[in-house]
Amino acid sequence: MFKKIIVFTSCFLVFACAGDNGKITYVEDLTTLKNTSSGQVIGFKHINNSTAWFGIPYAKPPINELRWRAPQPIEDSEKIIKATSFSDICFQNRSFVDYSEEKENYIGSEDCLYLNIHSPRNLSGNENLPVMVWIHGGGNTTGAGSGYDFSRLASEQKVIVITINYRLGPFGWFYHPSLIETTNSKEDKSGNYGLLDQILALKWVKKNIKEFGGNPNNVTIFGESAGGHNVFSLISSNLASGLFHRAISQ
């Protein structure tokens, strides 16, 4: 068992840069096919001598009867997923992330519980590389995993890097007595749906990352701003016990 290490940084150098949330689709590469609990995912050869899989679902869409409920894992599936473009970002206020004069005040979708994986290129799946899971900032009201390009970090430092989406704003952190009348689940009643999303994403990583050449027993979570606060919440949560081994908070 690795000892958890908390690192505080004022200058956070991760060799990453902000990306684009647009629907760019990359050319699939069948040699990147991986079997996961979400299905058979096909990625692509990315920049900086890396391989990537974008838009892999790690939970059922949190809509309708699953809105304001703990996220539900996807049952083992054999469907083929072309993981060559980012998913929709989670529902959020446009003004915080996009200052263009559009009619709509909000962007994104409730169907947003997806993750993205960056790895060094041409791995066999037996490398047992360290794993890093990025938790984005944005006051828990804005942001997305697709806003960061970790291809260089993955290829140069020989690590597997995952970025995740989690529910934001009132969809991620909201409590009202009328919402819990029909459930006996403590998690459903907590109102901490965004944090529960992060925990389920970490469970997905633990279950599936070995297929991508990662070591499920060497996982570091790292985040900045609200993501950094979420790192501390994950450290203190019994529900996240055993899902990661090191932590970095900015």
PLM regions and their residue ranges:
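Non-catalytic accessory segments of hydrolases
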Residues: C17-N192, P216
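Alpha/beta-hydrolase active-site loop
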Residues: C112, K186-E211
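Short glycine-enriched nucleophile-adjacent loop
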Residues: G228-A240
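A conserved short beta-strand
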Residues: S241-Q250
